[in-house]
UniProtKB/Swiss-Prot annotation:
It is an enzyme of class 1 (oxidoreductase). Its main location: membrane. Its EC number is 1.6.5.2. It is a peripheral membrane protein. PANTHER family: GLUTATHIONE-REGULATED POTASSIUM-EFFLUX SYSTEM ANCILLARY PROTEIN KEFG. It comes from the Bacteria. The lineage of its organism: Bacteria, Pseudomonadati, Pseudomonadota, Gammaproteobacteria, Enterobacterales. This is Glutathione-regulated potassium-efflux system ancillary protein KefG. InterPro entries: Flavodoxin_fold (IPR003680), Flavoprotein-like_sf (IPR029039), K_H_efflux_KefG (IPR023947), KefG/KefF (IPR046980). One of its GO terms (biological process) is potassium ion transport. Belongs to the NAD(P)H dehydrogenase (quinone) family. KefG subfamily.
Length: 184
C-alpha cells in the first residue's frame, strides 16, 4: 500500500497571471493533484487585504509550502512580499512561541525574464541566482523551515512550448512525491 504524499500548499503570486504562458503551463498538471492546494494570492486578494488567520491556518494544514512567482526586481511580486511580512508573524512563525512552521519545507519555483547566463558574476544581473534568492532562504530559516533547492525557469516567456511542457511535467512529478526526489 502506497503512503499518501505530504500535503502541499502552492502559493501562486503573479499580478499579470493572464499574460504568463509559462506559469499557466506549470500550473496545469498540478491542478489534478489532490494533495496539492493551489492558492492564487492575486485572485484571492485583489485589494491586498490579507486574511492573516486564514493564511496561517492553511500553513498549519500543509507540510510543504511552494512559493511560485516571477522574479520581480530581484525579489517577488508586491502581494507576496506583503504576505510574507504579515503572515509569517512573530509568535506564529518566528520569535518567542513562533514555531508553527518548524520542520515544514519551503521551495521556491521562479520564472525569470532573462537567460541563466544573466545570473552570474559578470552577467547582466551581476550575481548568481543563489545570492538573489538568499532573502527567501533566510526567511525559511527564520521560520525553522527546511530550504529545498529552488526550481528556476529562466527566460520563461521565450521558452519553446515543448521546453515549458517538460518543466511542467518535472514539476508535477516532483509534487507527486516531493520529499523522495531530491529538491533539498
Amino acid at each position: 500500500m502506497m503512503s499518501q504524499p505530504p500535503k502541499v500548499l502552492l502559493l501562486y503570486a503573479h499580478p499579470e497571471s493572464q499574460d504568463s504562458v509559462a506559469n499557466r503551463v506549470l500550473l496545469q498538471p498540478v491542478q489534478q493533484l489532490e494533495h496539492v492546494t493551489v492558492h492564487d494570492l492575486y485572485a484571492h486578494y485583489p485589494d491586498f487585504f490579507i486574511d492573516i488567520h486564514y493564511e496561517q491556518q492553511l500553513l498549519r494544514e500543509h507540510q510543504i509550502i511552494v512559493f511560485q512567482h516571477p522574479l520581480y526586481t530581484y525579489s517577488c511580486p508586491a502581494l507576496l512580499k506583503e504576505w510574507l511580512d504579515r503572515v509569517l508573524a512573530r509568535g506564529f512563525a518566528n520569535g518567542v512561541g513562533g514555531h508553527a512552521l518548524t520542520g515544514k519545507y519551503w521551495r521556491s519555483v521562479i520564472t525569470t525574464g532573462e537567460p541563466e547566463g544573466a545570473y552570474r558574476a559578470g552577467g547582466y544581473n551581476r550575481y548568481p541566482m543563489e545570492d538573489i534568492l538568499r532573502p527567501f532562504e533566510l526567511t525559511a530559516a527564520m521560520c525553522h523551515m527546511h530550504w529545498m533547492n529552488p526550481m528556476i525557469i529562466y527566460w520563461a516567456r521565450r521558452q519553446k512550448p515543448e521546453v515549458l511542457a517538460s518543466h511542467a511535467q518535472a514539476y508535477a512529478q516532483w509534487l507527486q512525491s516531493p520529499l523522495a526526489t531530491g529538491g533539498h
